[in-house]
A protein has these predicted regions:
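Charge-rich, low-complexity N-terminal segments
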Residues: 1-123
Length: 123
């Protein structure tokens, strides 16, 4: 089994609805998103995925969230923009963009602080 990972960072604000504590107020993070792709074999070029293709798909999503209030971006207008929900959203959106190439994310991990992360993967 092969595994490749791509990381990217973005700055964004959010607040948590119905939360009791300081995170209920608008605040920001320098987030890191980490995308891992797994495959049982490499292609004829010797790659699981071209990092350029993965980077382009990730950049499309980063453009939507960077320097924004996440609560103003669907689905986070209705769903709390927690690290868990962000990880699931990135996973689903990357899968939608990469599936036509036969590429599917294995796991997406979101870091909202250097020591706090959440991950999403399909079983």
């Amino acid at each position: 089994m092969f595994e490749v990972t791509k990381k990217a960072t973005f700055a964004a604000a959010h607040f948590l609805r119905e939360y009791q504590g300081p995170c209920s107020r608008l605040h920001g993070h320098n987030w890191t998103v980490e995308v891992t792709i797994r495959a049982p074999k490499v292609d004829k070029m010797g790659m699981v995925v071209d990092f350029m293709d993965l980077g382009r798909a990730l950049d499309e999503l980063l453009e939507m969230v960077d320097h924004r209030n996440l609560n103003e971006i669907p689905p986070f207008t209705e769903v709390n923009p927690t690290s868990e929900n962000l990880a699931a959203w990135f996973h689903q959106e990357l899968d939608r963009r990469l599936a036509p190439q036969g590429i599917h994310p294995h796991v997406v991990r979101i870091w909202e602080m250097p020591d706090c992360s959440a991950a999403y993967w399909k079983e």
